[in-house]
Amino acid sequence: MSTKQKRFILPEDEIPRFWYNIQADMKNKPMPPLNPATKEPLKPEDLYPLFAKELCHQELDMENAWIEIPETVREYYKYWRSTPLVRAYGLEKALGTPAHIYFKNESVSPIGSHKLNSAIAQAYYCKEEGVSNVTTETGAGQWGAALSYAAKVFGLEAAVYQVKISYNQKPYRRSIMQTFGAQVTPSPSMSTRAGKDILTKTPNHQGSLGTAISEAIELARTTPNCKYTLGSVLSHVTLHQTVIGLEAEKQMEMAGEYPDIVIGCFGGGSNFGGICFPFMRHTIKEGRKTRFIAAEPSSCPKLTMGKFEYDYADEAGYTPLLPMYTLGHKFAPANIHAGGLRFHGAGVIVSQLLKDGLMEAMDVPQLETFECGCLFAQSEGIIPAPESCHAIAAAVREAKKCIETGEEKVILFNLSGHGLIDMASYDQYFAGILVNHELKEEEIEKSLGGINKI
């Protein structure tokens, strides 16, 4: 009888009581976001019209490494946390690798992804402030579904702008949001000035996260007692996601191992930061030798081909100016099925860490991600979301290197969500309809030309 342990699960009383704020430990702090009107460093009160006040302070906190998780939020975390750390014996066998592969299974949440970790927190802070309405954007619909559920939990009305290509590709995510009472609008739309401007110039525009953010911000500004919420990119969102890595840290101890490589797929940075930052703390403070890999789509390679500049997080220029690796806020990504990764820029924390060499980035073509996603499903029994397939592909690449070297490296990746509502994407892959989208240098240069140098 085998004594090998497959899953490592923490009891409820070991769910983290604090989020980890890596900004407090970074030797080189991120450059300050700028007020778009004055070009002066952003102050928390500059963000009050958009976000709940506590979130504004979390966003710019450079001093406190540990932020207490409100007890109400932690009680809701118990609905699905802790999430399992799983030893991927099946994948190891399929690859014939000596590497030890682990994944943190965030697909077990009620929504099927990691996004609920921040949605519950943001909705809680909005409710505490007396807010009645929240708006947001969503790509594939994972964040929109999470925010819709969290809003319902705290008695808030939710309005979601979903990127049009994903709105059409993933109708069941729309149904999930509507099940929780949210109003869902395809973006760009004619309901906002930002949307009208884009559709006037490009009537068949299929949308982008940057466009959907503009519309959600505009609606929040024009709706009484309303706040905007965001699913990635900003630092407070990444903060909430560190519950993933903090749990994984304890679970790796249970497994008797420590990762040589930690991997997360990359859209705006919250999923990557959530799994990586708690381990990166040991690299910064103790000199642990761990590689941290952000796996991004070849069609939206902001980390591997973008420039480090001050840029907006949205197409219309409503957000603060963020110091980040960007392809330009006017960038229109290809219509890949990993809708949650179709964002032009990276969060300020990740951008600074990449600039300082504390992490690395890897771009992965669409077809390779689906190939690896199918291999993972066949060997581990979980169909991964197209976004998560990027992390799997990066893990497979690293595990194959171990075949050549004979090293038993320990690889940890975050399975950010399941793909059971993304089967139309898999259908297109099996039918041979999907293709690889790769950007040319001249396309990137043209897109970057729209950035005003600060």
Where are these regions (language model features)?
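Positively charged, low-complexity intrinsically disordered leader regions
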Residues: 3-131
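Claisen-condensing/thiolase-fold acyl-transfer catalytic domains that form or cleave C-C bonds
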Residues: 266-270, 274, 366-424, 428-432
